[in-house]
Amino acid sequence: MDGVDVVISEIRRLSLSVIGSITVPYKKKLRTALDRVVLNNEPLTIHSYAVLDVEIGKEFAEAVNYALQEFGIKNNRIIAVGSHGQTLRHSPSSAPPYSLQIGDGATIAALTNITCISNFRSLDIAKGGQGAPLVPAFHEWCFSSEDKERSILNIGGIANVTILNSDNTHPLGFDTGPGNCLMDEWTKLHLGKPYDKGGTWASSGKTIPLLLESLLDYDYFKKDIPKSTGREEFNLRFLREKITSTSMRSASSENIQATLLELSPIRLLLH
C-alpha cells in the first residue's frame, strides 16, 4: 500500500513491451485512512466507504495522467486502463466468500478519458476460485513452454507463485504467505521508514528460532493449494500475538526483523 504503480505497455499477439513505469506514493491522508481500515480493521460507514472509493479512484486517475505526461503519450493512444483496485478485505474462505477492492473505475475513466476495466476478482470468486493471485493467466501467456515446467515467483507485500506445466494443463497460482508486508510494518513501527532499504536493518540482527517456529506454525501455511491471503491476515496484530505467545517481547527489534526476513523464503521453499 505504498502507492500507485502505473505501467504503460504495448501488447501484441505474441509480444509485450514496456514503454514506461512509475510509482506515485499515496497522499498521506489517504495512506492513513487505508492503514486504519486494512491494518487496524476499523469499521467504515457506508458514506466513508463511498468517499474513500472515489478518492482512491481519483488517486489512480492522477497517477495515470501523470505517467502519460511523463512519457509523452496522449490518452487517445491508450486502449484501456486495467485497475484491480486497492484491496480492503480479501476473504475467499468466508461464507459467502468475497474480495473487496476500492478505486472507482468510473472515476478513473472520467478523469483520464480512457476506458477503465476493473473489478477483476469477483467473477473468479463467484465461480469458486480464490480471486488471487491475478497473474497466472498472464504468466501462462508470457512464459509457458511445451518442453519445460516453470515457476514464476512474485514477492510483494504478499508472495505468490505460478506453476506452469509443460502438458498444457491450466496454470496453478497461489499465495505462499507474507513477502515484505510484515517487515515493512515492523520497519515503519520502529524506524519510521516505509521499508528496510537493502535489508540493512534485518542483516544487523539474528534469527530467533523459537519465534520463527511459531510463525511457521500458522493455519494458513497448512491449507491446501490453491489458496490466497492478504494484509488482513498478516499484519502487526498477527506479529504481536506471535511475539507475546513466545515470550519474545523483550527481544531486540532487529532480531525480530531478521526472523521475519527468514520467514518468507522458508515458506516459499516449503511449498
Predicted stretch roles:
Residues 2-27, 172-269:
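Conserved ATP-utilizing enzyme core subdomain
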Residues 7-66:
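Glycine-rich nucleotide/cofactor/substrate-binding loop typically near the N-terminus or early
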Residues 15, 40-46, 70-77, 91-97, ...:
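Short, glycine- and charge-enriched coil/turn segments that flank and shape catalytic ligand pockets
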Residues 46-103:
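Short beta-strand-loop/turn "lid" adjacent to the catalytic site in phosphate-handling enzymes
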Residues 59-62, 66, 107, 111, ...:
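Alpha-helical scaffold segments in soluble metabolic enzymes
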Residues 61-69, 139-144, 262-270:
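Generic structural signal for well-ordered alpha-helical scaffold segments
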Residues 81, 108, 264:
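Divalent metal-coordination and catalytic microenvironments
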Residues 92, 96-99, 110-194:
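Phosphate-binding/catalytic loop of phosphoryl-transfer enzymes
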